[in-house]
C-alpha cells in the first residue's frame, strides 16, 4: 500500500474549536512548554468569546482546581489538553466559572468553563489558549486549520489514525 492509500483509507478524528477567535501557531505561544511541544502538538487560539466548549464527544479527565485548564479524552481515545492563557494559574480561579465536572461525559459544544475575558485579559500574561493532543505519537498525521474559528462549529485539527 502506498502512503496515499493509507492516508485516504485511514480513520480520522476531528477536533472542534473550544473557543471562538483566531488560530495561532503553537510555536508562537509565549511559553516553551507549549511552543516546544513538550506536552503535545496542536494549535493555539486567540479567543474572542467567553465560553470554553467541549471540542470532542468524550469524557472530561480533570478540570484544574484553578479552572484555567482541563483534559478531555475523546470517544476514540484522543487525549486533549486545553490551557486558557499563559500564567493564568496565578489567578487562582478568579475570572473562571466551572460548568462541567471531572469524569463527566460531554458532547461537542457542551459548556465546560465560562470566562470573564476582560478581567483575564487585564490580569494574565497572555490569553492565547493552547489546544494540544497529549498522545500525538498515536497518530499518523495531524492537519491543523488556520484563520478565524467559531466555537463548537469549526474543525481546528484533524488527526489521522
UniProtKB/Swiss-Prot annotation:
Residues 31-135 form the PTS EIIA type-1 domain. The keyword Phosphoprotein applies. Gene3D superfamilies: Glucose Permease (Domain IIA) (2.70.70.10). PROSITE patterns: PTS_EIIA_TYPE_1. SUPFAM superfamilies: Duplicated hybrid motif. The modification Phosphohistidine is found at residue 83. GO terms for molecular function: kinase activity; metal ion binding. The phosphoenolpyruvate-dependent sugar phosphotransferase system (sugar PTS), a major carbohydrate active transport system, catalyzes the phosphorylation of incoming sugar substrates concomitantly with their translocation across the cell membrane. The enzyme II complex composed of PtsG and Crr is involved in glucose transport. The EIIA domain is phosphorylated by phospho-HPr on a histidyl residue. Then, it transfers the phosphoryl group to the EIIB domain. This is PTS system glucose-specific EIIA component. It comes from Buchnera aphidicola subsp. Acyrthosiphon pisum (strain APS). The lineage of its organism: Bacteria, Pseudomonadati, Pseudomonadota, Gammaproteobacteria, Enterobacterales.
Amino acid at each position: 500500500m502506498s502512503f496515499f492509500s493509507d492516508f485516504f483509507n485511514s480513520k480520522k478524528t476531528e477536533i472542534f474549536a473550544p473557543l471562538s477567535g483566531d488560530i495561532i501557531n503553537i510555536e508562537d505561544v509565549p511559553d516553551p512548554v507549549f511552543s516546544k511541544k513538550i506536552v503535545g502538538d496542536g494549535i493555539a487560539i486567540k479567543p474572542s468569546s467567553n465560553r470554553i466548549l467541549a471540542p470532542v464527544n468524550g469524557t472530561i479527565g480533570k478540570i484544574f482546581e484553578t479552572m484555567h485548564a482541563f483534559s478531555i479524552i475523546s470517544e476514540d481515545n484522543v487525549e486533549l489538553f486545553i490551557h486558557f492563557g499563559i500564567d493564568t494559574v496565578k489567578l487562582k480561579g478568579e475570572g473562571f466559572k466551572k460548568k462541567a465536572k471531572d469524569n463527566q461525559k460531554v458532547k461537542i459544544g457542551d459548556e465546560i468553563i465560562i470566562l470573564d475575558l476582560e478581567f483575564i485579559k487585564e490580569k494574565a500574561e497572555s490569553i492565547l489558549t493552547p489546544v494540544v493532543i497529549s498522545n500525538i505519537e498515536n497518530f499518523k498525521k495531524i492537519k491543523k486549520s488556520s484563520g478565524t474559528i467559531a466555537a463548537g462549529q469549526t474543525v481546528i485539527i484533524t488527526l489521522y489514525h
